[in-house]
Amino acid sequence: KSGGIRASGSITAEDRQFWSFQPVKDVTPPAVKNGAWPRRPLDQFVLAQLDANGLSPVGEADKRTFIRRATFDLIGLPPTPNDVAAFIADESPLAHERLINRLLESPHYGERWARHWLDVARYGEDQAHTFQARMYPNGYRYRDWVVSAFNNDLPYNQFVIEQIAGDLLPDANGRLERLPALGYLALGPVYYKDAGCAGKAESDEVDDRIDTLCRGFLG
């Protein structure tokens, strides 16, 4: 309580060098000792850091281990015995690539990964934490929209725009399909408003929307 007031509006030259404020640019992958290990340019960055720390890549996982890891990671479910047997029997050099593509095309992929964004959006179909339980009977529409966005590979910029202003976009043809995206703003808490605290309750509701918007999109 006795500390000084932090100066506001003072951004130093050092602050401006923070990595997330830098413009995106092409970077040349670093040279590595084992040129046979990297399969993609990104692998060169990984291997360069391993080399710098005196570490070596582990060997490739066997196919049974690989399909279990990939399936749990991408769709959150174990592979079926038939899936495992088919993958092990597939001797094509494209077997791993085909497996990943199949998992990415699964509807379970969107269900698995949408849940992380739904946490950001503080998604819930009710407001049971208040003394007056309030249900959101159409809340599932926002959940389904997010799942669909992941499964249909909706570009991130469009993903953001539709959740903030999907009803204001000029394309009228897709307006009804975009409306559930506004659940990002609509599914927040709604407080009881009596004659003595209606103004504060409304302010708290707006504060929640601003907080969720800023935390979700601005960090």
Where in this protein do the model-derived segments appear?
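C-terminal capping alpha-helices of c-type cytochrome domains
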Residues: K1-G4
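Short, structured secondary-structure elements
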Residues: R6-G219
